[in-house]
């Protein structure tokens, strides 16, 4: 079962995404703050990260840099989401894909499959 880690501080967004992904057969872990990402990820060992740019305690780009510096997650696919114009910054930090909010949650499984098949 593919493990997805949602990194987002918006409870409603997390609840929606978690419910939809679990219905699609994904195992989901959640980190609501940037500071929670590494401890939760080290326990859950996700196959892919779905991360919001704006978090309560830090921005997602800083979290991406931390993940890329960690041997276990250096190559784990990261999808960053935001309504802000931060695509270049996110990709330069190491995100594999940037999605503009709002996005269609139903498109995520296909994107996950593509990223995991590509070995990114």
What are these regions (language model features)?
Residues 52:
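Active-site residues of response regulator receiver
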Residues 15-23:
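Charged docking surfaces used in two-component/phosphorelay signaling
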Residues 62, 84-100, 110:
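Alpha4 helix (beta4-alpha4-beta5 surface) of REC/receiver domains from two-component response regulators
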Residues 103-114:
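C-terminal output helix
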Residues 25-32, 40:
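Short hydrophobic/Thr-rich beta-strand motif most characteristic of the beta2 strand and flanking loop
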Residues 14, 56:
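The feature encodes the CheY-like receiver
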Residues 39, 61-72:
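Short amphipathic alpha-helix used as the core "switch/output" element in two-component signaling
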